[in-house]
Amino acid sequence: MQLKNPILGLCQQSTFMLSAAKVDQCPDDEGFEVAFAGRSNAGKSSALNTLTHASLARTSKTPGRTQLLNFFKLDDERRLVDLPGYGYAKVPIPLKQHWQRHLEAYLGGRESLKGLILMMDIRHPMTDFDLLMLDWAVAAGMPMHILLTKADKLTYGAAKNTLLKVQSEIRKGWGDQVTIQLFSAPKRMGLEEAYTVLAGWMELADKGAELPAE
């Protein structure tokens, strides 16, 4: 017998709930939430769409198109949250500051937030934004898992070397609270590992359904 990852079915049936410009517009602060963060063009929306097998998150050629906290329902207790992207140049500074204020309020005060998935473009990892998110997560005691996205853009050997290098840097600077993996949305690389992390944070790790082995 083999175990089916319990989060898989929930992700496949996920639906859009609402968008929030401010924390007081978010759903009730109960249950389990996992948030997805990343600089613009880090592949966040593509990763989220691949994990949910749907076009839930808006993808765009214009960096920073996601301007709101977008909530997606997995079941009555569990949600995924697509956070605004950062690093774009075409957005007015006052609007950036507005997003940053409310993002910080969400990250710092959300009791149902159980973990943070941080997307880094494997070709440009550890940007200033990434370092800020790492500092915040460790200081807040928030579990973080990093997806080194667009791993298909490098050879496997080069991707593996980057993974080991970034992993070593993170352990030295931030300890073992942060985990990391390779990920590619087009190649569907790293899905099972990411699902396992989500299941653990959402307390589904021991609820796998047994399936006949193929």
Swiss-Prot record:
Residue ranges constituting the EngB-type G domain according to the UniProt record: 30-204
InterPro entries, A to Z: G_ENGB_dom (IPR030393), GTP-bd (IPR006073), GTP-bd_ribosome_bio_YsxC (IPR019987), P-loop_NTPase (IPR027417)
GO cellular component terms given for this protein: cytosol
Binding site for Mg(2+): S45, T66
Cited HAMAP family: GTPase_EngB (MF_00321)
Descriptive protein name: Probable GTP-binding protein EngB
Example of a GO MF term: metal ion binding
Residues binding GTP: 38-45, 64-68, 82-85, 149-152, 182-185
Keywords carried by this UniProt record: Cell cycle, Cell division, GTP-binding, Magnesium, Metal-binding, Nucleotide-binding, Septation
Biological processes per GO annotation: division septum assembly
NCBIfam families noted in UniProt: GTPase_YsxC
Entry keyword annotation includes Transport: no
Organism from which the protein derives: Pseudomonas fluorescens (strain Pf0-1)
Top-level division of the source organism's lineage: Bacteria
Family from the record: Belongs to the TRAFAC class TrmE-Era-EngA-EngB-Septin-like GTPase superfamily. EngB GTPase family.
Protein role: Necessary for normal cell division and for the maintenance of normal septation.
Requisite cofactors: Mg(2+)
Pfam families: MMR_HSR1
